[in-house]
Regions:
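HotDog/MaoC-like acyl-thioester-processing domains
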Residues: 1-13, 81, 96-97, 108-163
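Hydrophobic beta-strand-centered segment that forms part of the acyl-chain substrate-binding groove
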Residues: 71-101, 107
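Short, solvent-exposed helix-to-loop capping segments enriched in aromatics
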Residues: 14-24, 71-80
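A structural signal for short, well-ordered beta-strand segments
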Residues: 44, 87-91, 105, 119, ...
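Catalytic strand-loop segment that frames the active site of acyl-thioester-processing enzymes
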Residues: 24-60
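A generic structural signal for short beta-strands and their flanking turns/coil linkers
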Residues: 28-30, 40-42, 83-87, 99-101, ...
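Compact, glycine-rich, soluble single-domain proteins
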Residues: 53-66, 70, 74
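A short, polar/proline- and glycine-enriched secondary-structure boundary/capping micro-motif
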Residues: 54-58, 85, 140-141
């Protein structure tokens, strides 16, 4: 028996297994490895690699940190058609080659189809990133949506009506 199973027996509780239902095709080598997933909560670990380096000093480009944080936010919401609509982020400390960044994402607020997710990233005990991610859950995949009606399409020149 594992220590978690023993603890669950002692507490009389068993954690429900949560299966990731979004972003299943993502490259975890570049976007972070999903370590823990619970309802509204995930932990991701990003191991920095030479492909992420921005300069000769080994600085990791912030886009990789953001991408891992975004992945964590989407996984915390864990809805098939979740998309990011806005974020406000702070990069608090640099990350370098071979650092491991641990990312924690928690859903903080739910309103209809909207979810706000707080994401923090640490390297050891140093906070390197913090962000608020605003997401929305769509009825279908974002690439399957018809975003413009026929009149708007004609106005922007993407589709011409023939009479």
């Amino acid at each position: 028996m594992t220590s978690q199973e023993i603890e669950e027996l002692d507490l009389g509780t068993k954690k429900e297994e949560v299966i990731l239902t979004t972003h299943n095709e993502i490259n975890q080598y570049l976007n972070g490895e999903l370590l823990v997933i619970e309802h509204g909560y995930v932990e991701v670990r990003l191991r920095t690699t030479p492909e992420m380096v921005a300069d000769k000093h080994g600085l990791i480009h912030g886009g990789f940190i953001f991408s891992a944080a975004d992945y964590a936010a989407m996984a915390a919401v864990n809805e098939t058609n979740v998309v990011l609509i806005a974020s406000e982020c702070q990069f608090l400390s640099p990350v370098k080659l071979h650092d491991e960044v641990n990312i924690i994402a928690r859903v903080r607020h739910k309103e209809g189809r909207k979810r706000n997710v707080n994401v923090v990233a640490f390297m050891h005990d140093i906070k390197v990133f913090e962000g608020e991610f605003k997401t929305v859950i769509l009825d279908k995949h974002v690439l399957k949506l018809k975003l413009l009606d026929e009149n708007e399409e004609t106005a922007v020149g993407t589709k011409k009506k023939r009479g």
